[in-house]
Amino acid sequence: MDRDFLKGAAVLGIAGIIVKILGAVYRLPLSNIIKSEGMGYYQTAYPLYTLLLTISTAGFPIAIAKLVSERRAIGDYKNAFKVFKVALMGLFLGGVITSLFVLVQADNIVNRLGNSNAYYSLIALVPALFFVPIMAAFRGFYQGRQSMTPTALSQIVEQFFRVVVGLFLTYLLLDRGIPMAAGGASFGGSMGALAGLIVISIVYIRGRGTVKEELSLTKISDDYRVNQIIKDLLLISIPITIGASVVPIMDTIDLVIVLKQLQSIGYTEELANGLYGNLKGMASTLINLPQVLSVAIAISLVPAISRANARKNRREMEDIISSGIRITLLIGLPAALGLYALARPIIELLYYKNDMDTIINTAKLLSILSFGVIFLTLVQSLSAILQGLGRPIVPAVNLFVGAVAKVILSYTLTRIPQINIYGAAFSTVTAYGIASILDLISVKKYAKMKLDVMSVFIKPFISAVGMALLAFLSYSFLVARLGSKLSTVVAIVVGVILYAVLLLVTGSISSEDLGLLPKGDKLGKLVDKFKLIK
């Protein structure tokens, strides 16, 4: 069973990384097509969509999986399937209610937000609000059967169709105006959800014979009433939903505050939307890119720490925790300082179709948000560590504290004319900074350990500073000779090479650290063979 669990975790982990990469790559061409105006409309709809989906579905796949798994474990296949049917009907009704609510209220919602042109972006997501809850029921059912491939496959197909259909419709509708084109991008999410649902439904239909065979093998079956199933599902899913809702709630409140506060200090609806698009649709996209690697680390940490904790192997547990934090900083620090050092050149390289005002504003936002990469990647890994230690609620509480601080700062700072949209960026960095510090304190408390400050923090910091400094100097030297775009690419390559050298020189990384990365075991053996690491 342990092998099945690890295999399942690996399958979902790989799928999660693929989905993250597709999502990150999607935003870059999209931003160049609909620019900051369109990204403002798009990003007005998505936080609301994410929040509604989180509330209606977040905890249910896990709850369904838990109840199905428990019933199957005692041979009660009949009631295991009954759990799935009850959950499917409940999520179907939830999807109908949520999608109808947005369909009827979409115009009122965007007007209250102060961004009326976001109507098409929001209304285009209505089908997804219906399809995704149904898909969540199927995913929970298969996860309860220790079959993670259907979930992983549906996730990848969903994201692939979202990207392809979204970009296609954006191009197709561009002549109809930016609001309509942004709606086309949003509709890609609905088509992706439909594609994912179709795939997992096909898997279910093809496997119905196996399910029927299981039902005939039922050894024991008590009277598991529908109202009790609903109660059990809610008892498991509600706490999970509350924890998962922190970030969507934070983003939604941020959306409301930022747009309204900018308009209160004299910005028109269009200008406020454009600035919001610079923040959420362009600068924040780059901040999320390093998560592709930090998510992979987080996935590795949970089972590794849980296993060491279960064996009561304290030395192994402390080594894994230290390596997890160090390797996270080895990713987060250079990404943060590199984005800060080359903020303007990177924005000019990636968002070249936007006007100069947009590029300048987005570069300033990126220079502020770049420091958030350190805290955001830390929050992911530290949350995984706390989950491995059996404290899953703690990181959610810590993130909630950060979210409260973000709301207060966003409200206060964005209404100051000299600060405006930059206050929202600063509040985001502060929120994740607070959460990461609280998570770090919690890890030290529950793991009852001290971290080696030199190896975990100082050495990675020195290497990252050296990398960022040389990358900046390389760009400054080359820009007059090669132009901005080529100089940016060369500076990044130079920075990466120097960073690798500095890691080896300072002894910032060990072969054990590499084991937490995808294919890290093979990489660790390779560097040991050539004695690249001390």
Language-model features, listed with the residues they occupy:
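Short membrane-interface helical motifs at transmembrane helix boundaries
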Residues: I97-N117, A336-D355
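N-terminal membrane topogenesis motif
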Residues: M1-L22, K78, K82, I220-D251, ...
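Membrane-interface junctions at transmembrane-helix termini in multi-pass inner-membrane proteins
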Residues: V132-S154, F371-V401
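Alpha-helical transmembrane segments of multi-pass membrane proteins
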Residues: N115-A137, D355-L382
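Specific pore-lining/lateral-gate transmembrane helices of multi-pass inner-membrane transport
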Residues: S69-L88, L275-S370
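Membrane-proximal transmembrane or re-entrant/amphipathic helices at the cytosolic face
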Residues: L473-K534
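Membrane-interface helix-loop junctions in multi-pass transport and translocation proteins
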Residues: T149, F160-V203, I393, A403-I437, ...
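Signature of the first transmembrane helix
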Residues: D4-I62, F92, S99, L103, ...
